[in-house]
Design a protein with these regions (language model features):
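A noncatalytic interaction/capping subdomain that flanks phosphate/NTP-handling catalytic cores
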Residues: 1-158, 162-163, 176-180, 187-300
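Post-Walker A alpha-helix
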Residues: 170-171
Length: 300
């Protein structure tokens, strides 16, 4: 079985050669991220369904995600990712990852149901594909940001903030207003020429918004709830202090931290970044658009 995905212009191919059934697939919203082109993949993942995981010697620990999620160890062949079952905290999948994060060989425990033996693609996508994609993205000057993303015919907005800051709420309001909500939880930002582009991802928040679309980023807002709507300018240092904690960083690859900081500095220098405090009222959509229109008229 083959599964081809496209996320933020990265093509990812999963191949399970034994052709076991894939359970709970495609799970929403990954269906809209399926890639039906024949273009060469950027990340290749080969999967073997097994009764028992192979025994690999685990070298020095590179990263521990804690909370019973996964660990990354160094090996002579690259990196070994140990994915843990969230219920038993025992390994349920192993993956050997090449040093350039373009190939991954995976062994996953089979799942037994009344209809027979199979495998669960979501146990490969989370976290194995995320690790490869995040590393490649950071190495190539992109960002995965804890944020919502919205496209209108003339604008592209990012709303970033900690959990509970209002990303899904704003997404609901903009969706009702007819805008295209790319995600209410995680957005990818990549630069194309002189333009920063925002890309939807299949990782969703409470609103379950996800679209495989992209467009130019025109405004970035650091958001929080308040008694009334208000937009305030921020200094570059203040923007960085608010955005950095919302970035998903590949802490297992310290070589990319410098490039990530350079990407953030470039973004802050070229895209208007402001603080948005808003009351939980739908008219915040009109407020934002009116304030930005007024600012544009004053500037011109």
């Amino acid at each position: 079985m083959k599964i081809n995905l496209q996320i933020a212009d990265y093509r990812i191919r999963l191949t399970e050669a034994q052709d076991y059934p894939a359970f709970s697939w495609p799970m929403h919203p990954f269906g809209s991220f399926l890639d039906r082109s024949d273009l060469h993949p950027d990340i290749v993942i080969t999967i073997t369904v097994v009764e028992k995981l192979p025994n690999f010697s685990q070298g020095p620990l590179r990263f521990d995600a804690c909370q019973g999620l996964w660990r990354l160890h160094e090996t002579d062949a690259g990196l070994l990712l140990v994915s843990l079952d969230t219920r038993t905290h025992q390994p349920c999948a192993l993956a050997l990852i090449t040093k350039n994060f373009s190939h991954m060989e995976v062994w996953t425990l089979g799942e037994q149901t009344a209809s027979g033996k199979g495998w669960v693609p979501m146990k490969i996508l989370n976290p194995l594909v995320e690790v490869c994609l995040l590393t490649r993205l950071a190495r190539e000057g992109g960002l995965l940001l804890h944020s919502a993303g919205v496209l209108s015919p003339t604008s592209g907005y990012i709303f970033t903030g900690q959990s509970g800051a209002g990303k899904s709420t704003l997404s609901e309001f903009f969706n009702t207003d007819g805008a295209s909500v790319l995600s209410d939880e995680r957005m990818i930002i990549r630069k194309s020429g002189d333009t920063f582009l925002i890309h939807g991802t299949p990782w969703v928040g409470s609103g379950a918004f996800a679209k495989n679309e992209s467009g130019p980023l025109t405004e970035l807002f650091c958001i929080s709830h308040g008694a009334q709507h208000r937009i305030d300018r921020l200094s570059p240092s203040a923007v960085l202090a608010l955005i950095l904690p919302q970035c998903f960083l590949p802490h297992w690859d310290r070589s990319v931290i410098e490039s990530t900081m350079a990407c953030l500095s470039d973004l802050i220098a070229h895209v208007p970044c402001q603080r948005l405090t808003f009351a939980k009222q739908p008219d915040v959509v009109d407020y934002i658009q009116n304030q930005l229109t007024r600012t544009t008229l004053v500037a011109s």
